[in-house]
A protein has these predicted regions:
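Charged, low-complexity interaction regions that mediate assembly/partner binding
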Residues: 1-67, 81-84
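Conserved P-loop NTPase motor core of helicases/translocases
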Residues: 82, 179-181, 224, 232-314, ...
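Conserved lysine of the Walker
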Residues: 215
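Pre-Walker A (Motif I) flank of P-loop NTPase domains
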Residues: 200-207, 231, 288
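Walker A (P-loop) phosphate-binding loop of P-loop NTPases
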Residues: 212
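Conserved helicase motor core of SF1/SF2 NTP-dependent helicases
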Residues: 229, 237-241, 296-299, 309-313, ...
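Pre-ATPase regulatory/linker segments immediately N-terminal to the P-loop/RecA-like helicase/translocase core
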Residues: 2-15, 59-200, 256-264, 274
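Hydrophobic positions on the alpha1 helix immediately C-terminal to the Walker A/P-loop
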Residues: 218, 222
Length: 409
């Protein structure tokens, strides 16, 4: 089974269209209609930035953002901060005239001393955006429907158009056969040392980690060891939460204190959680340093690379959530690659429906991790000791892993 570059590109194009179809209607809609008619756009005044949250005051004359709703927060040009000046402007027009913007999520509502207004708290606001608006207390902010993650798809499309990068071709152009091998079970007491030694023997390997087997701890320990040897390391994951879990592990405490751990797109709540985590606007390999970045940003770095393999090691966490092309991006970025995931977890969530995936034969391009494991092209190692369950629960969970799990007593 082999995919042409056109097949790779077409899958990403179809997914891109599916993701943007509904959003495009809103993006081209009059902003006043979204504000007054559908209640999908909101205008508020910054009150404070406190304890990792952004507090904004909204009028009770219109609907408020719903708790749990993800929104794009925009700082517009001075004239457009007054919605009465919007006229026929569309959401797209406002977006083009933003000074800065950040993703945000509504987390609470509260009454205001002035009964005509309500206070709303937001988290996940980027640190650079928060620092900019903090300079102008009381500034007017506009909240709009969040953009779908189209940059991820666009970055991967650029990558699949590259045909002269051997490391990328080793994933995208490979002839995959269903040739599953038995996972090599890791029974060593020092799993991080075992994985480290195996990584020295191959330039790419897969680590299968059932629930509670210490994948995050292992990644942190491995990063600390590699960086202590002067290596440059990139860890990429689907979510910022996974990256923050890694940053919070004890193995990285010394590196954090010495300002050797960096993360892209740090939010104010992440900064509150880990004040020693260094913000970095662009990915750049540095000796003895660890960089944490999501697939969305790391894929852009890979697409921009003119010279491949800048990092000594790239570790992909949450690999079961990665599209096949993202594995190619990792190969382009790192001399050595470690993919960490669990084939029993959910495959990547895509907007294309099942019929379209089946008709286009896109299944393996969606579930890249399972294809990599089943093909037998790379050595696969499995963690066997679970720290989350007793033996009885480990036995039940182990039914999905050929009865290989044992509880850590």
């Amino acid at each position: 089974m082999q995919f042409t570059r056109q097949q790779h590109w077409q899958f990403l194009e179809d997914e891109l269209k599916a993701e943007t179809e509904e959003y495009k209607k809103k993006f081209l809609s009059p902003a006043m209609s979204l504000l007054k008619d559908s209640g999908e756009m909101f205008v508020g005044q910054l009150v404070a930035l406190k304890d990792g949250e952004m507090i904004v005051r909204f009028s009770n004359n219109r609907s408020l953002p719903r708790k749990g709703e993800f929104l794009l927060c925009m700082l517009l040009q001075q004239e457009l901060r007054n919605y009465r000046n919007w006229g026929d402007c569309t959401y797209r027009d406002l977006y083009k005239n933003r000074y800065n913007a950040s993703d945000s999520v509504c987390i609470w509502h509260s009454a205001s001393p002035d009964k005509e207004y309500s206070l709303v708290g937001f988290s996940r606001v980027s640190l650079d955006f928060a620092q900019q608006v903090a300079e102008t207390p009381g500034v007017i902010l506009v909240f709009a429907p969040q953009r779908p993650p189209i940059d991820y798809m666009l970055n991967l499309q650029r990558l699949v158009r590259e045909e002269l990068t051997p490391s990328l071709s080793s994933v995208l152009d490979a002839n995959y056969q269903c040739n599953p091998q038995s996972n090599s079970l890791i029974k060593s007491e020092d799993t991080a040392d075992y994985v480290y030694k195996q990584l020295l023997l191959t330039n790419s390997m897969i680590l299968q980690g059932p629930p509670g087997t210490g994948k995050t701890y292992l990644i942190a320990e491995l990063c600390a060891r590699l960086c202590s040897e002067g290596k440059s390391v990139l860890v990429t994951a689907m979510t910022n939460r996974a990256l923050m879990e890694i940053a919070g592990k004890p193995a990285l405490s010394q590196m954090l204190q010495s300002e050797h751990v960096f993360k892209t797109n740090i939010t104010i709540d992440e900064h509150k959680e880990n004040k020693h985590l260094e913000p970095i606007s662009h990915i750049s390999p540095m000796p003895s340093c660890l960089i944490l970045s999501t697939y969305y940003i790391a894929s852009g770095f890979a697409a921009e690379l003119s010279l491949p393999l800048p990092f000594d090691c790239v570790i992909m966490d949450e690999a079961s959530q990665a599209l096949l092309a993202m594995f190619g991006a990792c190969k382009k970025m790192g001399k050595r690659c470690l993919w960490v995931g669990d084939t029993k977890q959910l495959a990547p969530i895509v907007s294309l429906n099942r019929d379209r995936i089946r008709f286009g034969e896109y299944g393996h391009m969606v579930d890249g991790f399972n294809l990599m494991v089943e093909s037998g092209k790379y050595p696969v190692f499995q963690l066997t000791k679970t720290y989350r369950f007793g033996q009885r629960a480990a036995d039940y969970t182990g039914l999905f892993y050929n009865n290989t799990l044992i509880a850590n007593h």
